[in-house]
Amino acid sequence: MLYNIMLEVAKGDYITILFALILFDFITGFLKAWKWKVTDSWTGLKGVIKHTLTFIFYYFVAVFLTYIHAMAVGQILLVIINLYYALSIMENLAVMGVFIPKFMTARVQEELQKYTAQLDAGKDLLEEFKGEKK
């Protein structure tokens, strides 16, 4: 019975939508880091781990809630997770220069400042390494 529920949840639209949003968020996040030239393996690994754990967590919560016939709660949780991923995707696109809604301007400015600081820190480190800055 549990196996059938796991298959039912895996074939469901909710899991497919969540997977698509997670994949798109990961891709836009990678492209954002690549555009700003701040890619590093640790950040990418953290992103893969975070997205994978989010997907696995929701999948098993959905299986459990389907098992106890309370999937309505799971759908509410999924809407919250999907909104978080949609916001993250819009933030990634905005940092890359794509048009964004006005309500996201402050968040995007924070992200831009973060990446600018990372770039400045990298330049300082490079200058120190070359012996140009004392």
Curated annotation (Swiss-Prot):
Protein's gene: CPH1
GO cellular component assignments: host cell membrane; membrane
Top-level taxon of the source organism: Viruses
Membrane disposition: Multi-pass membrane protein
Name of the protein in its database record: Holin
Pfam families: Phage_holin_4_1 (PF05105)
Protein family according to the UniProt entry: Belongs to the bacteriophage holin family. Cp-1 holin subfamily.
Primary location class: host cell
Its biological purpose: Produces a lesion in the cytoplasmic membrane allowing the phage lysosyme to attack the peptidoglycan.
Classification via InterPro entries: Phage_holin_4_1
TM segment ranges: 15-34, 55-73, 78-100
GO process annotations (BP): killing of cells of another organism
Protein's UniProt keywords contain Glycoprotein: no
Keywords: Cytolysis, Host cell lysis by virus, Host membrane, Membrane, Transmembrane, Transmembrane helix, Viral release from host cell
Location within or outside the cell: Host membrane
